[in-house]
């Protein structure tokens, strides 16, 4: 025999669902505010007070706010597409991450938070050095690839010159064989650096209590 729920039971279930929905909405709002705050910081750091903004978020959603801000800032920490890095923007992101770390609910005391901030600052400096090293290594690798390919390219130019009866210059990147060789070597190098950088960013998140599994 089917159990017929009372009006009170049904009302309580609806209330429970409403409470869950409201909690999810508050969490979503906290995440959005965190992202907006981090974006503003990158444009105009002096206009953002993370401590005050976090204080305005309900305590149960404060960590969501901080994690969302951290995620936006950490996207600035990436391998440059060209050989240069935007050091000023990276340093601004690092400064904000240190502030966010100090506000994390992971720490039971101010002393613990300060220690974590020091560790984050040290790790971020290592990341900056790593990115600078990457830029230099990419320049050297590109030059080494061009030097290695130069004899083949000169031979192709010589053959074309003999056919056309005039001197010929070939842009290395317009040569499919060279382009494939270049891409394969540069992509492999970039992948190694990208993996190492991702690991360092995960360490940053873990130090602050912003890892996705926390």
Which positions does each model-derived feature cover?
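Intrinsically disordered or highly flexible coil/loop and linker segments, enriched in small
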Residues: 21-24, 43, 47, 136, ...
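Long amphipathic all-alpha helical oligomerization modules
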Residues: 143-214
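Alpha-helical context
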Residues: 6, 14-17, 29, 106-110, ...
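Leu/Val/Ala/Ile-rich N-terminal alpha-helices, chiefly Sec-type signal peptides and the beginnings
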Residues: 1-63
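Long amphipathic alpha-helical segments with strong coiled-coil/leucine-zipper propensity
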Residues: 38-142
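Intrinsic-disorder-associated interaction segments
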Residues: 1-4, 27-31, 43, 58-59, ...
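Generic alpha-helix signal with a bias toward terminal, lower-confidence helices
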Residues: 16, 20-27, 53, 77, ...
